[in-house]
């Protein structure tokens, strides 16, 4: 009986990647950097002007996220990097989201934050960013030009591009979202 239990436990643990072998810090960092590059590529595909916005900004953050909603509750997680364009300093970050309201579904989405000032980037990296249930935004092009076309202005000097599949989301409807440093990868 003990042998059968041991065989079943080994079989189950080997079928779960996180249990079977923990990735090294370097491997985990590489996976997060790849996910961030995928997020940038997805945004550039649907909003080509975002490339200039990212490259000319003080810094940016790129996240690849996964969310799920079942009946009245939902949530999501994600990982990404924040990069200071001047120093090329990279900070590994995480995202967690909690939602309430009716719904059902699973989605994968990419977020690219653009920070016009080093102060805005520093605040994001060192204090995180929380978005409450009332957070909404609209694309503002007026004085800022076409570089931010398709982005949501969250605060002065902070823009957000959100891509789900191959389409650009022009409205942010995040609820209870927190961004914070990844203590294991930094």
Give the residues covered by each predicted segment.
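N-terminal export leaders
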Residues: 3-7
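Bacterial N-terminal signal peptides
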Residues: 11-15
């Amino acid at each position: 009986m003990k042998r059968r239990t041991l065989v079943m436990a080994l079989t189950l643990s080997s079928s779960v990647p996180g249990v079977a072998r923990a990735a090294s810090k370097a491997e985990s960092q590489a996976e997060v950097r790849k996910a961030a590059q995928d997020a940038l590529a997805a945004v550039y595909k649907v909003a080509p002007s975002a490339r200039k916005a990212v490259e000319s900004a003080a810094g940016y953050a790129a996240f690849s996220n996964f969310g799920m909603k079942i009946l009245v509750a939902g949530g999501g997680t994600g990982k990404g990097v924040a990069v200071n364009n001047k120093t090329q300093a990279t900070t590994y970050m995480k995202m967690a989201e909690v939602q309430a309201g009716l719904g059902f579904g699973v989605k994968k989405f990419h977020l690219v934050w653009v920070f016009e000032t080093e102060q805005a980037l520093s605040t994001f990296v060192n204090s995180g960013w929380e978005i409450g249930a009332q957070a909404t935004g609209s694309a503002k092009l007026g004085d800022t030009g076409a570089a931010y076309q398709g982005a949501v202005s969250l605060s002065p000097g902070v823009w957000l591009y959100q891509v789900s599949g191959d389409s650009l989301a022009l409205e942010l409807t995040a609820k209870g979202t927190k961004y914070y440093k990844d203590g294991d990868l930094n």
